[in-house]
């Protein structure tokens, strides 16, 4: 089993990297890619939300299929789907279309949904790493997940911004090329890591229903408030970040290079916080206080962005974005840890899976709400609305049953 370990690690790592890289290339450029078809906030929000909706619905099924039929075929099909979705998106934004045609918008939504359905590769590639790692080395192997995601978040905006200077659709074609390379590596190097004797039957339909999972944790008095806070945090955060580039484009006249640089700042700061700082900070301050500090930082960053009133002060945006990334890097792992600590070991899988479902649901609902608000109430409204929701999150976390005990332990 030692000989295939390196190609297996390479295949899993490339799959995880491609999952983050392709999305962080495409997402910041959506307002520029949509400019010919529908440059409004509502369409942008719906397009961003459609990707998350597909992931929300399909991810539990993809995980179950990989447990039943093996990791390799599921990863290959998902990466192939990513090639199809990205390729369709790239082709659609590259072709000339009549101004009155709704076909390109329809194709863009189909492409994003296909790519979202294929997003289950991250969970299955993580399962590959678990399959090939003994328990005492699993944490070190799982560090590859953070490295891959961090590289993807950093390289994606940089690559997208630089290539968009040549032609706005070009980054999507390059993302498609990365996905093709990923597929070739999977087909040629990735062995099956789940033995036949370890495979499971497909679960009941109810167990694949993401809403059923969510209902279980939200009605649990011990973690319900924290899980509601987790959902509201991602609802607010994914809402205003979905229209962030559109705001930069319309308010300051930024092009793709400057707009994607803001997301590059997010990637660098978030990677440093979650990869280097979060461990020592948790030991020193505790998860509960870190969550509240992070929420305050996100609110400050969120309100700073519309506070920059003129293009001459636009560099202050990067400070606000860095504060946002710092706060998010503190909140996400700390809030997950609070839920995890409150539950017994036997409830970990269900709870953490439910948190992922809540995150996906917030990522689906947030962008359309923010986009509609942007169009109807003005460009500042998504930021003000997000700040109000985040204040509610602070109230929920402060009043959770964990507050007192966690404070004492910290």
What are these regions (language model features)?
Residues 1-5, 191-228:
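Juxtamembrane intracellular "pre-TM" segments in multi-pass secondary transporters
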Residues 17, 85, 99-120, 315-330:
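Hydrophobic core of transmembrane alpha-helices in multi-pass small-molecule transporters
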Residues 28-42, 242-259:
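Short amphipathic helix-loop junctions that connect adjacent transmembrane helices
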Residues 59-70, 273-287, 374:
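Helix-to-loop junctions at the C-terminal end of transmembrane segments
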Residues 68-79, 283-295:
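Cytoplasmic membrane-interface "Motif A"-like loop-to-helix N-cap segments
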Residues 80-101, 297-311:
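C-terminal ends and interior cores of transmembrane alpha-helices
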Residues 109-150:
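Cytoplasmic helix-loop-helix junction between adjacent transmembrane helices
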Residues 288-335:
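C-terminal transmembrane helical hairpin of 12-TM major facilitator-type secondary transporters
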């Amino acid at each position: 089993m030692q000989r295939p370990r390196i190609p297996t690690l390479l295949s899993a790592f490339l799959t995880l990297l491609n999952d983050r890289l392709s999305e962080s290339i495409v997402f910041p450029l959506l307002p520029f890619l949509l400019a010919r078809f529908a440059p409004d906030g509502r369409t942008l929000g719906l397009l961003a939300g459609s990707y998350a909706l597909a992931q929300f619905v399909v991810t539990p099924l993809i995980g179950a299929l990989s447990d039943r039929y093996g990791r390799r075929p599921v990863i290959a099909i998902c990466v192939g789907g990513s090639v199809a979705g990205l390729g369709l998106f790239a082709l659609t934004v590259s072709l000339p279309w009549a101004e009155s045609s709704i076909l390109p918008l329809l194709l863009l939504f189909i492409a994003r949904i296909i790519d979202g359905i294929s997003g289950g590769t991250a969970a299955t590639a993580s399962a590959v790493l678990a399959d090939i790692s003994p328990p005492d080395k699993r944490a070190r192997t799982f560090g590859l997940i953070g490295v891959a995601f961090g590289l993807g978040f950093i390289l994606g905006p940089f690559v997208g911004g630089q290539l968009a200077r040549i032609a706005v659709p070009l980054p999507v074609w390059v993302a498609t090329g990365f996905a093709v390379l990923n597929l070739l590596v999977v087909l040629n190097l990735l062995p099956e890591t789940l033995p036949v004797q370890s495979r499971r039957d497909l679960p009941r339909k109810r167990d694949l229903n993401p809403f059923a999972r969510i209902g279980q944790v939200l009605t649990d008095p011990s973690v319900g408030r924290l899980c509601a806070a987790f959902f509201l945090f991602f609802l607010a955060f994914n809402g205003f970040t979905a229209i962030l580039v559109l705001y930069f484009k319309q308010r300051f006249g930024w092009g793709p290079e400057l707009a994607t640089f803001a997301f590059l700042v997010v990637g660098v700061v978030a990677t440093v916080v979650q990869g280097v700082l979060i461990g020592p900070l948790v030991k020193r301050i505790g998860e509960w206080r870190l969550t509240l500090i992070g929420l305050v930082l996100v609110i400050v960053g969120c309100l700073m962005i519309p506070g920059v009133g003129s293009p001459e002060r636009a560099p202050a945006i990067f400070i606000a974005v860095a504060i946002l990334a710092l706060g998010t890097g503190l909140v996400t792992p700390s809030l997950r840890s609070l839920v995890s600590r409150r539950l017994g070991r036997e409830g970990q899988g269900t709870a953490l899976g439910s948190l992922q479902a809540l995150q996906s649901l917030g990522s689906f609902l947030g962008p359309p709400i923010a986009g509609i608000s942007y169009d109807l109430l003005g460009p500042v409204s998504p930021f003000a609305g997000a700040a109000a929701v985040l204040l509610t999150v602070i109230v929920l976390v402060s009043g959770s049953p964990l507050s007192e005990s966690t404070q004492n332990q910290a």
